[in-house]
């Protein structure tokens, strides 16, 4: 998906450094989500080994130093990954504002290496995640390359935008007061952890439904151009690439649904599609669904 070049990027809620403290667990997307939790706690595997098997080559992918001064227009979002992440956050905010009365924007932080959060310290091995304490979505953009080289995703800009929309989906859950369910009997293919992540996938699909029609208030220009078939394929590939079953099979050679916390590849694809086809966040009630797919 390509941003319209006339869109103006708002970086006012985005930072690239800072610290915090706390003890609550951050909530991950499962494809950007807290891989430390998914891999290490559930599978008994060092996440550092998984994420560092291949070197990253982002020379033509990231402008150096997370320089947000380069993020001015949609053209910059199409060129630089950090600008694309910020612009996607702008788009997701614009979509949710009319859908959820009282919606407030989350903060966004771009980081590399180590970062302090309201949920405690984190590292680049964590990947993108959302912390409900400071209401901030954290993104290490190197993860998008890892998603391709380590997990077999097809990549593409819309796969990256989907990850952002998923983490913002956790913010929506936080505003609705349902995010805490992730900590209640979190494991298992039908557990609350899986239901929480699948709902965030569905919310990402809802964003995709509106992404090319919702206009920026200040310019009157839609944030994004219409979705292509490849965009959807890239999002579905990203969702599937780090489904619990895919990660377990890759890491241990077997799958164990009793330890799932994020959902299978098929489940994640299903719920993104549900949101994308309907544009109705009420359909995303995974907590009441008898069949998660």
UniProtKB/Swiss-Prot annotation:
Q: Where is this region: Disordered?
A: 1-22, 243-265
Q: Which domain of life is it from?
A: Bacteria
Q: Where in the cell is it found?
A: Membrane
Query: Could you list the residue ranges that cross the membrane?
Result: 25-45
Report if keyword Ligase is assigned: no
Chief place where the protein resides = membrane
Read off the Pfam families from this record.
Zn_peptidase (PF04228)
Q: Does the keyword Transmembrane helix apply?
A: yes
- Residue span of the signal peptide, if any? none
Q: Polar residues compositional bias: what residue ranges?
A: 248-265
The way this protein sits in the membrane is described as: Single-pass membrane protein
Task: Please name the InterPro entries in this protein's record.
Answer: Uncharacterised_pept_Zn_put
Q: What SUPFAM superfamilies does the record tag this protein with?
A: Metalloproteases ('zincins'), catalytic domain
What name goes with this protein? Uncharacterized protein Rv2575
Query: Which taxonomic lineage is given here?
Result: Bacteria, Bacillati, Actinomycetota, Actinomycetes, Mycobacteriales
